[in-house]
A protein has these predicted regions:
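Amphipathic/hydrophobic helical signal segments and adjacent flexible N-terminal regions
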Residues: 1-92, 100-107, 191, 195-208
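Short hydrophobic/aromatic-rich beta-strand segments that constitute the beta-sheet cores
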Residues: 65, 93-97, 127-132, 152-156, ...
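Amphipathic hydrophobic-ligand
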Residues: 76-80, 111, 166-169
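Hydrophobic/aromatic beta-strand elements that line small-molecule binding cavities or substrate pockets
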Residues: 80-86, 115-120, 141-145, 170-176, ...
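Short, solvent-exposed aromatic-acidic interface loops
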Residues: 98-103, 133-139, 159-160, 187-192
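Helix-adjacent hinge/juxtasegments
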Residues: 103-143
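Acidic, glycine-rich flexible loop segments
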Residues: 135-140, 146-149, 153-172
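Mixed-charge, glycine-accented linear interaction segment located at domain edges/termini
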Residues: 162-208
Length: 208
């Protein structure tokens, strides 16, 4: 086994070797024991969703499925994905997505894209805003509109990137719920290429 982080300056050895406490998983960083209402991805429980979230509420839940991606600068690929939309009673949705690359036979190859962010009601009826951060060094602000009670369209208003990130200049996304499943398509403009199809997936509700 490699040396890893043990003994690295600034990383306490006790923190790395602390035994598990047992019992239920307290969640990332022990968030479950904070003196705050827990967020939920299930509209059947507490807390009550904020009234301003009404146009976004069909998204609340945990969704999992598969998708396909491609771009002129890369080979086509298949991926699995889980997406979670949750709320804590305030007027925004907490969004998190994790994806993994799949082989031709459906086996999991390795972790892929991750996203975290917030979906917020906009200034006018039927409008909303989305803030997303990516570990690839990209941060995006989207402006969106409700196309129907179960369809949401959003396009980037701002794309900011770290000095080491690849060039991404714009994205457009369309989400829709069809026959109980969450479908989406993503168009991307990046690395000198114009806006064009990049991702498409179908996710089934697994919780909420």
């Amino acid at each position: 086994m490699g040396r890893g982080l043990r003994g690295v300056q600034g990383v306490p050895g006790a923190a790395l070797s602390r035994p598990p406490t047992g019992g239920p998983d307290p969640g990332p960083g022990g968030w479950a024991d904070l003196p705050l209402p827990a967020e939920t991805a299930d509209l059947r429980g507490d807390p009550e969703p904020h009234p301003a979230l009404a146009p976004l509420l069909p998204l609340v839940g945990v969704w999992r499925g598969t998708g396909h991606g491609g771009y002129p600068t890369i080979a086509d690929f298949d991926y699995g994905q889980q997406v979670r939309f949750a709320h804590d009673g305030r007027p925004f949705l907490h969004y998190e997505s994790r994806a993994w690359l799949l082989g031709a036979d459906g086996t999991v190859l390795r972790p892929a894209a991750r996203e975290v962010g917030w979906w917020r009601p906009g200034a006018a009826a039927g409008e909303f805003e989305v803030l997303l951060a990516h570990p690839t060094g990209i941060v995006e602000i989207y402006l969106g509109r409700l196309r129907s009670p179960n369809q949401w369209e959003l396009s980037t208003d701002v794309v900011a990137r770290a000095a080491t990130a690849k060039e991404v200049t714009g994205n457009r996304r369309l989400y829709g719920i069809v026959d109980g499943a969450l479908l989406y398509a993503v168009d991307m403009a990046a690395v000198g290429q114009p806006l064009q199809p990049h991702l498409a997936a179908r996710l089934e509700r697994v919780d909420g």
